[in-house]
C-alpha cells in the first residue's frame, strides 16, 4: 500500500495532461501571504494562459461579507518546488469585480511606475537582501535560544558554522535550493548577526520582477518553515535590547549609473532620496522605528545621511562604485516586513520621475 509520501510525490505527467497551479496573493495585513490551488491543462509556459480566479475577501480582511468576492489576476509564474513536474506557483494581484485594484494591491501602482518610458529606458536593477528570524513554534522565541533565556552576546554568529552558532541551516538550504528550482534569481544566503536570524538575496533583477520574486521567495520560505515546524518572523526588531534588527536592504542601479560617469548620477539620485526621506520612511515597513535607532548598523530614523562603505548610513555606496566611478547604491532603510512592490516602485519614482517643486 502506498504511504503518504508516495502519494505526495506522484508524478502526474505519467497519466494526465493536467497540472496544479498554486495561486498566491498578499493578504489583508499587507504582509501575510495566502494561496489556493486549482487544476488546469498543462503545460503552462506563459501567464496569459491562466484564467483569473476569485476568493473570499471577507476571510482575509480585504472585503466586506455582503460583497466578499475578490478577483485574482495572474501576473508571474514559477516552477513549483513542492509538487514539481509541470506544476507551478502563480503570483497574483487582487481586484474588485469591477476591475479596480483593492487597497492592499500595491503591485498595480508599481507596474505603472515600471512601465513609464523614462523608467523603462533606464533598465532599473534591484538586489534585495531579505533578513528574517526563525522562531521556535510553541514559545515564539528564536531558534537555538534557551527558552526564556538568552545566548551569548552578538559576535560569533554572523556567517558562522557550528552547532552552538548556526541554528536552522537545513531550513535555509532547503529554501535556497527550492528558490533556484522555482526560477527565482536568488543570489545567496548567509547567517546574520543575531543568532537565529538569516538572510537571502534576490537579484539583480529588473523592475517589477524583483518584487514578484521576493514575494514568491517569502512564500516558499513560509512553506519550508511549515514543514519544519518553525515560525518565520519578518518583524524588524523581534528581540528588544542589544540585538540586531531585521531589514531588507535594497540595492539599486540604473543604466546611467552603471555607465562611465554613473557616480555623479548616483549622487544626484541620493540628493532626491534625501528630500523625500520622510515619505520613504513612512512606506518602508511597520515597526521600523524600533530598528532604525542609530545602533546595530542602522541610521537614526529621523536623520538622513549617506556615505561610502558606511553601514550606519541611510544610503551606503560601495568602495568599488566610488573607485570605478559607476555602479549602484544600497538603501538600508527598508524593514524586513516591507512590501517590495512599494519599495522598488518608490525608489524608481523618486530617482527617475519625481521633480522637485
Swiss-Prot record:
InterPro entries: Gln_synt_N (IPR008147), Gln_synt_N_sf (IPR036651), Gln_synth/guanido_kin_cat_dom (IPR014746), Gln_synth_cat_dom (IPR008146), Gln_synth_gly_rich_site (IPR027303), Gln_synth_N_conserv_site (IPR027302), Glutamine_Synthetase (IPR050292). SMART domains: Gln-synt_C. High-affinity glutamine synthetase involved in ammonium assimilation. Plays an important role in the primary assimilation of ammonium taken up by roots. Plays a role in maintaining nitrogen metabolic balance during ammonium assimilation, thus controlling plant growth and development. Reassimilates ammonium generated during lignification within developing tillers, which is probably required for the outgrowth of axillary buds. Required for nitrogen-dependent biosynthesis of cytokinin. Active cytokinin in axillary bud meristem is required for axillary bud outgrowth and necessary for tillering. Homooctamer. GO terms for biological process: glutamine biosynthetic process. Coiled coil: none annotated. Keywords: ATP-binding, Cytoplasm, Ligase, Nucleotide-binding. Belongs to the glutamine synthetase family. It catalyses: L-glutamate + NH4(+) + ATP = L-glutamine + ADP + phosphate + H(+). This is Glutamine synthetase cytosolic isozyme 1-2. Its EC number is 6.3.1.2. Residues 19-99 form the GS beta-grasp domain. Induction: Induced in roots by ammonium supply. It holds the Pfam family Gln-synt_N. Expressed in roots and at lower levels in leaf blades and spikelets (rice flower). It is found in: Cytoplasm. Disruption phenotype: Reduced number of tillers and panicles. Residues 106-357 form the GS catalytic domain. Plants overexpressing GLN1-2 exhibit a poor plant growth phenotype and yield, and decreased carbon/nitrogen ratio in the stem caused by the accumulation of nitrogen in the stem. One of its GO terms (molecular function) is glutamine synthetase activity. The gene is GLN1-2. GO terms for cellular component: cytoplasm. PANTHER family: GLUTAMINE SYNTHETASE (PTHR20852), GLUTAMINE SYNTHETASE CYTOSOLIC ISOZYME 1-2 (PTHR20852:SF109).
Amino acid at each position: 500500500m502506498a504511504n503518504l509520501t508516495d502519494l505526495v510525490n506522484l508524478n502526474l505527467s505519467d497519466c494526465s495532461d493536467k497540472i496544479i497551479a498554486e495561486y498566491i496573493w498578499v493578504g489583508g495585513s499587507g504582509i501575510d501571504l495566502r494561496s489556493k490551488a486549482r487544476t488546469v491543462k498543462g503545460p503552462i509556459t506563459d501567464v496569459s494562459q491562466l484564467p483569473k480566479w476569485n476568493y473570499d475577501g471577507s476571510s482575509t480582511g480585504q472585503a466586506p461579507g455582503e460583497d466578499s468576492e475578490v478577483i485574482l489576476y495572474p501576473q508571474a509564474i514559477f516552477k513549483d518546488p513542492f509538487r514539481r513536474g509541470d506544476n507551478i506557483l502563480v503570483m497574483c494581484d487582487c481586484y474588485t469585480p469591477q476591475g479596480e485594484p483593492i487597497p492592499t494591491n500595491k503591485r498595480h501602482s508599481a507596474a505603472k511606475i515600471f512601465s513609464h518610458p523614462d523608467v523603462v529606458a533606464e533598465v532599473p536593477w534591484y538586489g534585495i537582501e531579505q533578513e528574517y528570524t526563525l522562531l521556535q513554534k510553541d514559545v515564539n522565541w528564536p531558534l537555538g535560544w534557551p527558552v526564556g533565556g538568552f545566548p551569548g552576546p552578538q559576535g560569533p554568529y554572523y556567517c558562522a558554522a557550528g552547532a552552538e552558532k548556526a541554528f536552522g541551516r537545513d531550513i535555509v538550504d532547503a529554501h535556497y535550493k527550492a528558490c533556484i528550482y522555482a526560477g527565482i534569481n536568488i543570489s545567496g544566503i548567509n547567517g546574520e548577526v543575531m543568532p537565529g536570524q538569516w538572510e537571502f538575496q534576490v537579484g539583480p533583477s529588473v523592475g517589477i520582477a524583483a518584487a514578484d520574486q521576493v514575494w514568491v521567495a517569502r512564500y516558499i520560505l513560509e512553506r519550508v518553515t511549515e514543514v519544519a515546524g518553525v515560525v518565520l518572523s519578518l518583524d524588524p526588531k523581534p528581540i528588544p535590547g542589544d540585538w540586531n534588527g531585521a531589514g531588507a536592504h535594497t540595492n539599486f542601479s540604473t543604466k546611467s549609473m552603471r555607465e562611465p560617469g554613473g557616480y555623479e548620477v548616483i549622487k544626484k539620485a541620493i540628493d532626491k532620496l534625501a528630500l523625500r526621506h520622510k515619505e520613504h520612511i513612512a512606506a518602508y515597513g511597520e515597526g521600523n522605528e524600533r530598528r532604525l535607532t542609530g545602533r546595530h548598523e542602522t541610521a537614526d530614523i529621523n536623520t538622513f545621511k549617506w556615505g561610502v562603505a558606511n553601514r550606519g548610513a541611510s544610503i551606503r555606496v560601495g568602495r568599488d562604485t566610488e573607485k570605478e566611478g559607476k555602479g549602484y547604491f544600497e538603501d538600508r532603510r527598508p524593514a524586513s516586513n516591507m512590501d517590495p512592490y512599494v519599495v522598488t516602485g518608490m525608489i524608481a519614482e523618486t530617482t527617475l520621475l519625481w521633480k522637485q517643486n
